[in-house]
Every structure is written in C-alpha cells, then in structure tokens.
Design a protein with these regions (language model features):
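N-terminal helix-turn-helix DNA-binding module of bacterial transcription factors
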Residues: 1-59, 352
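Short beta-strand segments enriched in small/hydrophobic residues
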Residues: 18-21, 56-70, 179-197
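Alpha-helical recognition/docking segments in bacterial nutrient-uptake
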Residues: 3-4, 58-174, 254
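A general structural signal for well-ordered alpha-helical segments in protein cores
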Residues: 5, 16, 34, 52, ...
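Conserved acidic
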Residues: 25, 29, 51, 70, ...
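Short gly/ser/thr-rich secondary-structure transition/capping motifs
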Residues: 43-49, 103, 124-126, 242, ...
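Bacterial carbohydrate/catabolite-sensing allosteric modules
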Residues: 43, 84-89, 137-144, 148-353
Length: 353
C-alpha cells in the first residue's frame, strides 16, 4: 500500500496539517518539527510515491513559490494564503527562498526539486526576459508577481502601487498633514540583475516611484527635489525603521506626516519614536503599506494600505491551474491587479500635529 501524508504525520508524531506545512516549506513550522517530518518522509519513501504519481498522471500536484525571503511578514502571509488556495484546488505549495540573490533564484527555479513542480509563482529578484524564464522552466506555466520584469508571455499578478500610494498620501492630507515625507529606499535586492540603463524596477522601486510622483504632484517639485528633501532612505525592515526614526529626529522632525513604503518600516519607526518620547499621531502621523497582521496590534495601531492577499492567492492558483489543466489551449497572458483597502487607525488619528 502506498504511503500517504497521514502515514508520514503519524510517523513524525504531528498533525496532518503540520506535516503538510512542513513538507511544503511553510514558515509557521519550527526547524525541529520540519526536520522530524522530513526524516519520517524519507524513512517511509514518501518522495518515491510522488515520483510514482507523476508517472501515472504526468502531474505532481505541486506549485513552487519562489520568494526573496520569508522574513518579511508580507511574504509569510502570502505563502499561507497560497497554501490555503492550493489545498482547496487539490494541489500543494512548495516555498523556496532566494535570499535576495539573483543567482540563487535562478538555481532554485532550475533545480531538481523545482523540476517536479507543475507550475511556478515567482516573486523575482532578477529581471527576466521571456527567454530567460523559458530556459529555466521549459514549457511549464508561471505567474510573475509584480510588473518589473521584461516578460510578456507569462501571466502576472500585482498590487496597485500607484493607487495605494495615492490613497495613503491623500489620507495624510485629510488628517491635516501639510508636510509629508517618504520613508524607505529603492531596493533591498543587492544582487538584483538590473540591466545597465534599464528603467525596470523592483517592487520597492515601483512603490518608491509612485510615492515620489505623488509628492511631486502635490508640492509641484521634481523627483530629484523629493529625493533630496522628502526622503528618509532606509531598508525595508523594522530595524531600518528604528534607524529612520533616529534620522527623522536628528533632522529636526521636518514633516508632520510620514508615508512608509512598507509596514515593517512603519512599525520600526513607531517603536523608535516611542522610545524617544515622540508622540504619534500628535507630533507626527504615520501610515504604512501592505496590511500585515502586526499593524492592527501595535501601539499606537498602524494605519496602512492593506493588500488583498487572499485575492492575490486566489488569482495565482486560478491562473496556474487553468494553464496546467489545459496546456493546449492558447490564451493571451493575463494581468490581474488585486485591490487594496485603506485601514485608518490610531497612528493617523485626527488632532493636533
């Protein structure tokens, strides 16, 4: 009798759900538990059964999610939503991290494990052309996150950066802010393969440019002036947010409103300002972007532009499933833009600034 996932879970002494999450590389499983599950799978030859399944049906039922890093809560939350959607569709999600390395990303996509996948969802570090991706994944379907590669033949899913940024800036203005700054740098992808002279941008770059354009229109200034006068240039994590808070205070707190390009930056800023005795929102109002779970429980709670991650996951799985199940049906590449919701909370509450 073939070994089942339930058998592996029983051997490892974990629940069916935990076993499935561990085998798929999801972030909510401890390293110790993951090691125990993998050992049980190996002992029971569970991978062999996967190979047999492929021989029978020519499909593994696996979707590979290639992501820069699971440390940002945004990607962790997205992976959970993707796993839920994949399971509902009778598929399994495998998550692999490139650690922001273009070379590692290419290696992962072309690896033996990835060769088992029926399709790919890639949050890219490198800036691929159609030919690049085709060489790595062959004729398998792929969905690209964002609009910053040179691909034209693959489906893509993206969040509306310009619309989300504009809603955040408009919210700060409605709450009484007269001088608004941007917090966050262009990119954390230190090894990103950006062609010389290219106008192609990473997710960070797209959001950054949208913010610069919004403030340039608001203050009738050019981008260079915005960068020089209204940008606190830091990385996209909470430690850098704390550093941004210090830079903001050292510069004399020139803004009464701050738009952080990412919630993790904003949460770091809230902590740094609180430690220094700066009152939010009384002295400065802060809004983030993404809608990660911690934004609702910080002190003060963080206003944010929440991305529809369940909708994104649903779109990704639907696009992949259609192409996996109907490989001979030629359809034009689809682009799905998911929605956002502005969550107004305590960090931008109206009052004196």
């Amino acid at each position: 009798m073939a070994t089942t996932l339930k058998d592996v879970a029983r051997q490892a002494g974990v629940s069916h759900t935990t076993c499935s999450a561990a085998l798929r590389g999801l972030p909510n499983v401890s390293p110790r538990t993951r090691k125990k599950v993998l050992a049980a799978a190996q002992a029971l030859h569970y991978n062999t059964n996967l190979s047999a399944r492929m021989l029978r049906s020519n499909h593994s039922g696996l979707i590979s999610f290639v992501v820069p890093d699971l440390s940002p809560t945004y990607y962790s939350m997205l992976s959970v939503e993707l796993a839920r959607e994949a399971t509902s569709a009778g598929m399994q999600l495998v998550v692999q991290q490139s650690q922001h390395s273009a070379s590692e990303e290419s290696s992962i996509i072309g690896s033996a494990l990835s060769s088992l996948a029926d399709g790919f969802f890639v949050a890219p570090v490198a800036h691929y052309t159609d030919e690049d991706l085709s060489m790595l994944i062959g004729d398998k379907p792929a969905v690209i996150l964002g609009d910053f590669t040179q691909t034209t033949q693959y489906d893509r899913v993206e969040s509306p950066n310009s619309e989300g940024v504009n809603s955040a800036i408009q919210h700060l203005r409605q709450q009484g802010c007269t001088s608004i700054g941007i917090v966050g740098g262009m990119t954390d992808d230190k090894e990103a393969d950006i062609p010389e002279g290219s106008s192609i941008l990473t997710l960070q770059g797209l959001r950054m440019h949208a913010a610069m354009d919004a403030l340039a229109d608001l203050y009738h200034e050019n981008r260079e002036s915005i960068v020089n006068e209204r940008l606190i240039d830091v990385g996209w994590n909470s430690d850098e947010g704390i550093r941004a808070a210090n830079l903001f205070m050292e510069s004399g707190m020139p803004y009464d409103g701050l738009f952080c390009l990412d919630d993790e930056i904003a949460l770091g800023m809230l902590h740094g300002l609180h430690e220094a005795g700066v009152r939010v929102p009384e002295q400065v109002k802060i809004i983030g972007f993404n809608g990660i779970r911690h934004s609702a429980i910080s002190t003060p709670t963080l206003s944010t532009v929440e991305v529809d991650l369940p909708g994104m996951a649903s779109a990704v799985v639907s696009l992949l499933r259609r192409r996996i199940e109907h490989p001979d049906v030629e359809t034009l590449p689809q682009k799905v833009t998911v929605g956002t919701i502005l969550r107004a909370r305590e960090s931008t509450a109206a009052g004196n600034v």
